Swiss-Prot record:
Entry annotated with the keyword Hydrolase: no
UniProt-listed Gene3D superfamilies: 3.30.70.120, Periplasmic binding protein-like II
Role according to the record: Catalyzes the condensation of ATP and 5-phosphoribose 1-diphosphate to form N'-(5'-phosphoribosyl)-ATP (PR-ATP). Has a crucial role in the pathway because the rate of histidine biosynthesis seems to be controlled primarily by regulation of HisG enzymatic activity.
Protein name: ATP phosphoribosyltransferase
Free-text activity regulation comment from the record: Feedback inhibited by histidine.
Main location: cytoplasm
A GO biological-process term: L-histidine biosynthetic process
Recorded family membership: Belongs to the ATP phosphoribosyltransferase family. Long subfamily.
Enzyme class: transferase
Species this protein is from: Blochmanniella floridana
Record's catalysed reaction(s): 1-(5-phospho-beta-D-ribosyl)-ATP + diphosphate = 5-phospho-alpha-D-ribose 1-diphosphate + ATP
Localization, UniProt: Cytoplasm
């Protein structure tokens, strides 16, 4: 039986969010040993339990107060919310923040040989999907009537099997659609992974731990988006060079030993440093230009 005094976090056991969720928790300093078939794991260095479940179970675990935090795709969360609302429930939860992985889109797709002149083409059509409520919400706003065909997997084969005229499914690259003779025609929902918390009061211990995790998650995400830049530059071109660099803060400028005409510049960049920028820096006299990844960051 779970110790209710420990913080409980639900994450996807397997699937497109599983590895990134585990990586995020580990980068936040949570020491866990997740075996392939293990559904429950205990952090070695924090009072945290990790529950590994199906992604579509996570919203219910949060809304019913079984776990404290969950990492879930916004598409799954919104579908679960609409499902419960359609049943007369009023589920509650708190979205703490969007995360920097799990990008996808929920899109309409048609067979390659079918014409597309906008959503009105779907009037009266049969549409296969795993997201019936998101689909209904979108088409209801446009005043389009349709017939829903609920499938929990292999949605893309529905038109070829004669089950549906079109599909509404998650798309990342579009390769699966193309392999099944389909083309993406309309994006109805864009999604990323997010961190959610159950509603209601938590103990001071749990809330303090969540606050600590939020600071660490912010640091991990900011570090992923930032680079540490080091270079040598002529002192007379210093202002021009600094203006080229997209910095999070003002750079550190130090004199080079034995060379009064050149300086060393160190800075954290919160934007990508492209090859063109590096070439422009070199044209201004910069040398020994290094762009390094940042593992952790706290402001």
């Amino acid at each position: 039986m779970l110790d209710k005094s420990r913080l409980r976090i639900a994450m996807q056991k397997s699937g497109r969010l599983s590895k990134e969720s585990q990586k995020l928790l580990e980068q936040c300093g949570i020491k866990i040993n997740l075996q392939q078939q293990q559904l429950l794991a205990f952090a070695e260095n924090m009072t945290i339990d990790i529950m590994r479940v199906r992604d579509d179970d996570i919203p219910g675990l949060i809304m019913d107060g079984v776990v404290d935090l969950g990492i879930i795709g916004e598409n799954v969360l919104e579908e679960a919310l609409l499902t419960r609302q359609s049943q007369g429930d009023n589920p509650c939860y708190v979205t703490l923040r969007r995360l920097d992985f799990g990008d996808c889109r929920l899109s309409m797709a048609l067979p390659m040989d079918k014409p597309w002149n906008g959503p009105k083409c779907l009037q009266g059509k049969r549409i296969a999907t795993s997201y019936p409520h998101l689909l209904k919400q979108y088409l209801d706003k446009l005043g389009i009537n349709f017939k829903s065909c609920l499938l929990n997997g292999s949605v893309e084969v529905a038109p070829r099997a004669g089950l549906a005229d079109a599909i509404c499914d998650l798309v990342s690259t579009g390769a699966t659609l193309e392999a099944n003779g389909l083309r993406e025609v309309e994006v109805i929902y864009r999604s990323k992974a997010c961190l959610i918390q159950r509603s209601g009061n938590l103990s001071k211990t749990k809330q303090s731990l969540i606050d600590k995790l939020m600071i660490r998650i912010q640091g991990v995400i900011q570090a992923r988006e930032s680079k540490y830049i080091m270079l040598h530059a002529p002192a007379e071109r210093l202002e021009e060079i600094i203006n080229l660099l997209p910095g999070a803060e003002s750079p550190t400028v130090l004199p080079l030993a034995g060379n009064q005409h050149r300086v060393a510049i160190y800075m954290v960049s919160n934007e990508a440093l492209f090859w063109e920028t590096m070439e422009n820096l070199k044209n201004l006299g910069a040398s020994s230009i290094l762009v390094l990844p940042i593992e952790k960051m706290m402001e």
